[in-house]
């Protein structure tokens, strides 16, 4: 990772602390993974504080595949099976079946409908029957060990929510450029400056968890 581009945001610990502060304030953060992995940047929000306006930004500025990062416990509570029985995707991203709230939505596609689905899925008393399958929100199952077990955006998202003292559920989507290609670190930093969002890396979260 090009640390010189990240230098204005401080060191790894300072970058994580800035992200935790932003999340506690209901703001978004931008997380970039390793250059030798996906080398992509994701816009991440707390599922707990997510607003319709934030969802609209995710849909407008990102890939459109809005994912809900969940813990093992929540996946089991909702009885969400894996999307496929044999996951042979390059990075083992643990998609479950997609979901839709049964109540309070129309087609499920709008920003408001997707937020309703997410809030339904993370409610304390959520039940499997609260959700229809398939739908327009894509749950991801985070590994229990977080980024120390798998250096992915899914685990980084759940780790950040836990460290921020929020419900351990987050929403992510990959940032894309106008031409549809994926945004890399320089573009992610520019996006963060435009939207007043902190930028950090999966490597930063690993460093934070191993030193704090």
Curated annotation (Swiss-Prot):
Q: Where are the transmembrane segments?
A: none
EC number, UniProt record: 4.1.99.12
Q: Keyword set for this entry?
A: Lyase, Magnesium, Manganese, Metal-binding, Riboflavin biosynthesis
Enzymatic class:
lyase
Q: What InterPro entries does its record include?
A: DHBP_synth_RibB-like_a/b_dom, DHBP_synthase_RibB
Q: Where is this site: Essential for catalytic activity?
A: 136, 174
Q: Which cofactor does it need?
A: Mg(2+); Mn(2+)
Q: Which residues bind D-ribulose 5-phosphate?
A: 37-38, 42, 150-154, 174
Q: Which reaction does it catalyse?
A: D-ribulose 5-phosphate = (2S)-2-hydroxy-3-oxobutyl phosphate + formate + H(+)
The free-text note explaining how the cofactor binds reads: Binds 2 divalent metal cations per subunit. Magnesium or manganese.
Does Cytoplasm show up as a keyword for this record?
A: no
Give GO BP annotations, semicolon-separated: riboflavin biosynthetic process
Source species, domain of life: Bacteria
Question: Single GO cellular component annotation?
Answer: cytosol
Provide the residue positions that the database annotates as binding Mg(2+) 2.
Answer: 38, 153
For this UniProt entry, the molecular function terms from Gene Ontology, in alphabetical order, are: 3,4-dihydroxy-2-butanone-4-phosphate synthase activity; magnesium ion binding; manganese ion binding
Pathway annotation:
Cofactor biosynthesis; riboflavin biosynthesis; 2-hydroxy-3-oxobutyl phosphate from D-ribulose 5-phosphate: step 1/1
Q: Where does Mg(2+) 1 bind?
A: 38
Pfam families recorded for this chain? DHBP_synthase
Its quaternary structure?
Homodimer.
Query: PANTHER family from the entry?
Result: 3,4-DIHYDROXY-2-BUTANONE 4-PHOSPHATE SYNTHASE, GTP CYCLOHYDROLASE II-RELATED
Describe the function of this protein: Catalyzes the conversion of D-ribulose 5-phosphate to formate and 3,4-dihydroxy-2-butanone 4-phosphate.
State the family it belongs to.
Belongs to the DHBP synthase family.
Query: What name does UniProt use for this protein?
Result: 3,4-dihydroxy-2-butanone 4-phosphate synthase
Gene for this protein? Answer: ribB
């Amino acid at each position: 990772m090009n640390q010189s581009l990240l230098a204005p945001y401080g060191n790894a610990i300072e970058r994580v602390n800035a992200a935790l502060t932003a999340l506690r304030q209901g703001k978004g953060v931008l997380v970039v993974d390793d250059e030798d992995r996906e080398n992509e940047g994701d816009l991440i929000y707390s599922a707990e504080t997510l607003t319709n306006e934030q969802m609209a930004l995710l849909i407008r500025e990102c890939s459109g595949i809005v994912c809900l990062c969940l813990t093992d416990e929540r996946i089991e509570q909702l009885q969400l099976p894996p999307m496929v029985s044999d996951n042979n995707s390059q990075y083992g991203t643990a998609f479950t079946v997609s979901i839709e709230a049964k109540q309070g939505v129309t087609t499920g596609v709008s920003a408001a409908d997707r937020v309703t689905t997410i809030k339904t899925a993370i409610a304390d008393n959520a039940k499997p029957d609260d959700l229809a399958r398939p739908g327009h929100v894509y749950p991801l199952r985070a590994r229990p060990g977080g980024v120390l077990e798998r250096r992915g955006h899914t685990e980084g998202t759940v780790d950040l929510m836990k460290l921020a003292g929020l419900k351990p559920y987050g929403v992510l989507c990959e940032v894309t450029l106008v031409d549809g290609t994926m945004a890399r670190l320089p573009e992610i930093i520019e996006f963060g400056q435009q939207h007043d969002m902190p930028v950090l890396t999966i490597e930063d979260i690993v460093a934070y968890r191993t030193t704090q």
